[in-house]
């Protein structure tokens, strides 16, 4: 029979390795707030960059940031629920909310991926020149820097709390660093070599990554 102290989805306390439960809870909440904030900032900046560059690869990473924001918001709600004290309906706490959030994240994916494939396919057969590439470079560098700072903080929080939700949130942000770097490469190929096909091809690759990440 499980008890409240053995729920693997609650912040755990191990001698010399885990923080006190209230301190761990505060760290977990702070990590979820940080991830949602970063995602929202990136959505705004990438949206502006997409409008100014008309690059479908930027559209793809914008969609990815929308998915990140949704997943991070789910994790925020799950962590808050998991940290609630036991009640009559939840005798052993609310810790099972964290794994459920991981399952719910997959619901964000398919429609966005289909939309991106359609947009990238149209651009592949009707290539366009990318404008204001300097804006695209600047936004992608900003995205990489913010994501790296977020990942460092999440790694610290996971080390202190062992949170399942924060671990899952960190996993897709790790891949986002590579995605953002690939967008920079795509912009460079289009602007310097005139390889207009590189933009939609990368967008299609990101669409595949988005679907793969859901499973």
Task: Please name every model-derived segment.
Residues 2-40, 45, 52-215:
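Alpha-helical transmembrane segments and adjacent TM-loop junctions that form the membrane-embedded core
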